[in-house]
Design a protein with these regions (language model features):
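Papain-like cysteine protease catalytic cores
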Residues: 1-75
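Active-site signature of cysteine proteases
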Residues: 53-263
Length: 263
């Protein structure tokens, strides 16, 4: 909806003013929060705060161009979006929580869903079926989930859900045995904030370890410096079962048997 209403701009035209070659939004976040906390403390809104916030964003990220030249052509953000011929309505967001009806649209109650989008709620086995079908047919997957807990090994480049939570990584001499993940485990982890929507990544393939355990090959956004697999991670199937909050795929990537259930 944001793209359809506002358009899109190439990164080389609007790069968000990266500082020292990379983005660092911490200062911007603190400035915005301080400003908005001050606005709220006044208890009565004036007509100035919106403009002040917009100017702050412009100072840190740059002004959004009304028109720009790209590859020898002139565009507005809206006309460039039209040129790309991307239809946002062709993409479907799926989630999986058993406290809500399956095969129905739900409003996923997470901070990142500030646009109040609807997600199609399916069993977790369907999430995996959608992912596998997408990858086997040349589609990638936008993954929304949790990467902030103990078993997302940042230096080693992989993520698992080991049976033995206490075993130290350095003590392991072979691949970990992993927990069998259930629907009840998923909703318990979500409701207890053990799983949050703290990160988004791009799943582009699969792999297996020496024991035949399936892993999803995942492009991260943390750069390549000091990363074992050049910015990619391997998430085990058990990790994906437990830690996935939602996925987004093109409608043509969804198995027909599941697509037919979408109302």
């Amino acid at each position: 909806m944001i793209y359809k209403n506002n358009g899109i701009v190439p990164e080389e035209i609007y790069n968000g003013n990266p500082i020292e070659g990379r983005h660092n939004h911490s200062e911007l976040e603190y400035v915005m929060k301080g400003m908005l906390d001050g606005v709220l403390a006044g208890r009565k809104l004036t007509d100035k705060w919106d403009d002040a916030l917009s100017r702050t964003l412009d100072a840190y990220l740059g002004e959004i161009p009304d028109e720009f030249s790209y590859n020898g052509n002139n565009y507005s953000p809206k006309s460039f979006f039209d040129e790309l011929e991307i239809n946002p309505d062709d993409y479907i967001e799926f989630t999986s929580y058993n406290n809500r009806n399956y095969y129905d649209w739900i409003e996923l109650e997470i901070p990142d869903n500030w646009t109040n989008d609807k997600y199609f709620n399916v069993p977790i086995k369907d999430i995996l079926e959608i992912m596998d079908n997408a990858l086997s047919n040349g589609y990638s997957i936008c993954w929304d989930g949790d990467s902030g807990k103990d078993h997302f090994y940042r230096n080693e480049g992989y993520a698992v859900i080991p049976v033995d939570d206490e075993e130290k990584l350095e003590d392991r001499t072979e691949p970990e045995k992993e927990k069998e993940i259930t629907e009840d485990m998923r909703i318990e982890a979500f409701n207890s904030f053990d799983v949050t929507d703290d990160h988004l990544m791009h799943i582009v393939g699969t792999a297996e370890n020496q024991n035949g355990t399936k892993f999803y090959y995942t492009k991260n956004s943390w750069g390549t410096k000091d990363k074992k697999y050049d910015g990619y991670w391997y998430m085990s199937e058990s990790y994906v079962k437990l830690k996935t909050v939602a996925i987004m795929v093109h409608k043509d990537a969804v198995p027909k048997s599941i697509l037919e259930k979408i109302k």
